[in-house]
Amino acid sequence: MQKRIAVIYGDGIGKEVITQALKILKAVAKKYEHTFIFEEVLAGGAAIDECGECLPMKSLQICKQSDSVLLGAVGGPKWDNEPSHNRPEKALLTLRKELGLFANIRPATLLPQLSKASPLKDEILNRGIDFIIVRELIGGVYFGEHKLEEINGEKVASDAMTYSASQIESIAKVAFNIARNRKKEIVCVDKANVLSSSRLWREVVDKVAQNYKDVHLSYMYVDNAAMQICRAPSQFDVILTENMFGDILSDEASIITGTIGVIPSASLSNGTLGMYEPIHGSAPDIAGQDKANPIGTILSAAMMLELSFGLTKESEVIQKAVQNALDKGYRTGDMMSEGMQLVGCEQMGDVILESVI
């Protein structure tokens, strides 16, 4: 198999973690006789520094022509004073929109080796944490109309949370298909007691559910969901929600699993094209110090192999290699606990690589 992968190192620790993921992917390609062609793409703060814009047209074109995109992280305080249309984060929004990446898939799974790093009590952790958040990615308040105007002598700002029925239907089908292959439970999270857009979500999701009689659907207000994720996360299997709610809840879900450093994510289109990235930020405070955790990026690469390329066996090899490294007690600083062996970003990549080759 030959696949072309656009690689966005991005900012901060992005280059460090991506370097480790590429090392693993190259080993997988050699072992299973695949050809992965990697093409570096400028985006985010690095692109601003070099080209003056967060997402050069050349970068966008390369991503469109690729089979998948692998991203490290973008952003940092260095670019905080850039105008809103040219902030590093704007590159991500543009990529999602232009590539049609409407579905964000983010697992929240407690790795047993990291249970001590979770802030939750043992009585909660013992019930297990294993759910997926399916977040609509190119609609809602992030892409609605934004206004800043002066009315009666004072500034007034507004941001529109806009959704069409077709947008909701598309993401709902993704969630139901995922749930059908898991425990067949979906909780749709909204704020239907207040928001018209949430009421439309319920109307459309109810219709989609008619084609998935084997999947149990329930609804939960977002404020309650935020509480329940910490109080009783074992109740969840698949959470379906809109863009902003999903952004907030998925970050909350990541920390209860012990560390954001190990969590991957996928942003998918209607076809096989996807963008894969760890959920952590660019962490400029530790950039260049070999302290970053590469596991989230390595697992993102594993998701890419499975979801975009259909290479399930190869994906499982990477996942097992990560488990082996943790079983042996290797930990980066963010997940360190007593009795474990502290390693840096590069060494963690090397340890995982040993189980792949």
Swiss-Prot record:
Transmembrane keyword on record: no
> Site feature Important for catalysis: at which residues?
142, 191
Q: Which UniProt keywords apply?
A: Amino-acid biosynthesis, Branched-chain amino acid biosynthesis, Cytoplasm, Leucine biosynthesis, Magnesium, Manganese, Metal-binding, NAD, Oxidoreductase
* Pfam families noted in UniProt: Iso_dh
Q: What does the cofactor field's note say? A: Binds 1 Mg(2+) or Mn(2+) ion per subunit.
Is NAD included in the keywords of this UniProt record? yes
> Quick one: a GO cellular component term?
cytosol
Q: Which InterPro entries match?
A: IsoCit/isopropylmalate_DH_CS, IsoPropMal-DH-like_dom, Isopropylmalate_DH
Q: Which HAMAP family match?
A: LeuB_type1
- Similarity comment: Belongs to the isocitrate and isopropylmalate dehydrogenases family. LeuB type 1 subfamily.
Which protein is depicted? 3-isopropylmalate dehydrogenase
Q: Source species, please? A: Helicobacter hepaticus (strain ATCC 51449 / 3B1)
Q: What is the gene name?
A: leuB
